[in-house]
Design a protein with these regions (language model features):
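Carbohydrate-associated surface elements
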Residues: 153, 173
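Nucleotide-activated donor-binding/catalytic signature segment of Leloir-type glycosyltransferases, i.e.
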Residues: 244-262
């Protein structure tokens, strides 16, 4: 098959869970004999036609590596018309691009909690973020023929937000081997620690939606019970300076270690030195870092939330308190009984085998084939006319968004600075 992978961003601009899944899909689909082309936005000079990566020009969004673009290059448009299946991996600047240019079945995988990210990265209070996503999520997802949810709990979330396209559950997968059998397993000495400490590890972005601040507070409480507790943090992000200050404020400088970013093929080596994996995030869809830690034989201490509950069996492969405030007790329970923690880690390793990327790709290919059998080579009815009508509808949604966030006289000053007083138009779209 000629398969197009459409992503709003791609390596090297951004490396996150969605980008990693696109890379894994490409590698394994090509190993099966399929022809895969990645379509994304970015600096056109970074395109690598020989490797099957086509970037269309976009405007850089700050210094985070993301780009904004309203159309694909002529080359990308033409190539998309030649695809037999298009698989999209972002809600915005992905599905709508495929809908405009492709003439084949479109699949969309929902990798992100857009409701929580909208609340975290805009001045919107969470109820307002939820309200706008109840409009945008079904509208954009509705451009696809089938939606993939990486977990059952995320399928329910999509239904709750009004997505009505056929939704199938295909769990994200990983390359298990580097975690099951690390090439160069690390030891406590590589952290500068003695062998008798209990070492927790967190791997992920250092940003507000991951709730690393909350994790530090829970670790501080656990350290009062288990003084030999240590936490190694792998990753970078916009909250790093704030997190370092929080560590000092909590008097955790001696037991929290910021390890920065290590090459991905070395992550399994570092996990091999840890006793447990911890996260306080409630914004996950199907967390690859949790699955990787399980494959490395680590028990999980995490907050019960969508995505997490589909990976971790509480009391078997780790502990999942229903509230973040109970995470310290989960950590203490693991540290106080190392033998039980090791047994849970072995159970986690066994459970991780169902997340093999080969299984994920096989199920996805079955989905592609079923769509091709029932909806081959679709000629979409006047896609540009439908696009124009949809943009008019989206302009109305933006006006609703403006009504939601425009501050009152007693409103939030932060929102007032972000949104011009006396207008209901989106920034850059005020009436002339």
């Amino acid at each position: 098959m000629r398969i197009g992978m459409v992503s709003a961003t791609y390596d090297p601009s951004v490396i996150n869970g969605a980008v990693r899944m696109v890379t894994l899909y490409k590698q394994h689909l090509e190993a099966l004999g399929h022809e895969v082309t990645i379509f994304t936005l970015g600096d056109d000079q970074d395109s690598d036609r020989a490797a099957g990566i086509v970037r269309s020009p976009g405007f850089r969004l700050g210094d985070h590596g993301y780009f904004v673009g309203l159309r694909y290059s002529r080359e990308a448009q033409m190539l998309l018309t030649e695809m037999e299946v298009v698989h999209c991996h972002h809600l915005l600047m992905s599905v709508e691009m495929a809908h405009r240019y492709a003439r084949c079945p479109i699949v969309y995988t929902n990798h992100t909690r857009y409701d929580l990210y909208t609340g975290a990265y805009t001045p919107l209070p969470q109820p307002a973020a939820d309200a706008i996503m109840r409009q945008l999520w079904p509208e954009f997802a509705g451009l696809a023929d089938t939606v993939i949810a990486p977990s059952a709990s995320v399928r329910q979330l999509l239904l709750d937000f009004g997505v009505r396209e056929p939704i199938v559950v295909i769990e994200n997968g990983i390359e298990l081997e580097p975690f099951l059998r690390p090439h160069r397993p690390r030891a406590r000495a590589d952290f500068g620690l003695p062998d008798d400490v209990f070492l927790l590890v967190y791997v992920g972005r250092l940003s507000s939606e991951k709730n690393v601040l909350g994790l530090l507070e829970q670790v501080a409480r656990a350290c009062q019970v288990v003084p030999e507790l240590h936490l190694a943090i792998f990753g970078k992000g916009p909250q790093e300076d704030e997190l370092r200050a929080k560590v000092t404020a909590l008097a955790l400088d001696a037991c929290v270690h910021f390890m920065g970013v290590v090459p991905f093929d070395e992550v399994g080596d570092w996990l091999a030195a840890a006793d447990a994996f911890v996260t306080a995030s409630t914004s996950e869809v199907h967390p690859l870092t949790v699955i990787e830690a399980m494959a490395a034989g680590l028990p999980i201490a995490a907050v019960q939330s969508p995505g997490i509950v589909d990976c971790v069996a509480s009391g078997v492969t780790g502990f999942m308190p229903t509230e973040g405030e109970g995470l310290d007790s989960a950590i203490v329970a693991l540290a106080a009984n190392p033998a039980r923690a090791r047994a849970m880690g072995e159970a986690a390793r066994a459970a991780s085998r169902r997340f093999d990327i080969g299984r994920t790709v096989a199920l996805t290919v079955e989905l592609y084939e079923s769509l091709l059998a029932t909806r081959p080579d679709q000629q979409r009815d006047d896609p540009h006319g439908r696009w124009s009508r949809r943009t008019e509808k989206w302009a109305g949604l933006l006006d609703q968004l403006a009504q939601l966030v425009r501050p009152s006289d007693e409103g939030d000053e932060g929102a007032r600075r972000w949104w011009p007083a006396g207008t209901t138009a989106a920034p850059g779209e005020q009436d002339e």
